[in-house]
Amino acid sequence: YLIDPSVNNLSPTEAISLGLGLIFGGLFVYEMACRSPLAKYPLLFGLCLVALICAVTFLSTQWFSGRGAYIHVGALIGTIMAGNVFFNIMPNQRKMVAAVAQKGDIDPQWGAGAKLRSVHNNYFTLPLLFIMISNHYPMTYQHEYNWLVLIAIMANAAWIRHFFNLRHVGKTKPAILVSGAIGMLLIALAVSWPSSQSVSVEKSEHGDQALAVV
């Protein structure tokens, strides 16, 4: 299901190479950004991260089948999340615990770096959950604008997650949840609505069948 000749006639070797390059290349860019001065500006960093995910989503749909593209975007997000936990959040926590036990100084960067990555993981959760079950919703990855559909779903999912994050700190904003739900409903209607291309093809097929009968 990775290769779709109608999208890009890749050989298995080319498809695998592009897939691995997309995942580990995206991870490399993310890691470099986390270690750069950009990490000091969370909002700007977040916008750059959104741009990265959007670019990966678009490129993957130009290279692979819709199904394969969605899975590769999910693989990148999942790899970033796992790397954040195992190579930054947990090690930094151990350093802080060890420093407290030894009554030493705690480097503020340990907590700042772990918090930044933890926030990213938090907002990645719902988008990744959708990608994990997206195989059951072919109307999304088979859509003419499947890359835009996935971006819209991920953005809405992250927006809904924002509602729960605010509620955890005592701020309840129902408008966020309602607007997120409306957004999801509109996306569902959009992907369920037959495209003009499919309608014209269907009419053509019916016409051919009628001519054959005549």
Predicted features along the sequence, with ranges:
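Sequence/structural segment immediately N-terminal to covalent heme-attachment motifs in c-type
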Residues: 206-214
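Polytopic transmembrane helical bundles with strong interfacial aromatic enrichment
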Residues: 1-204
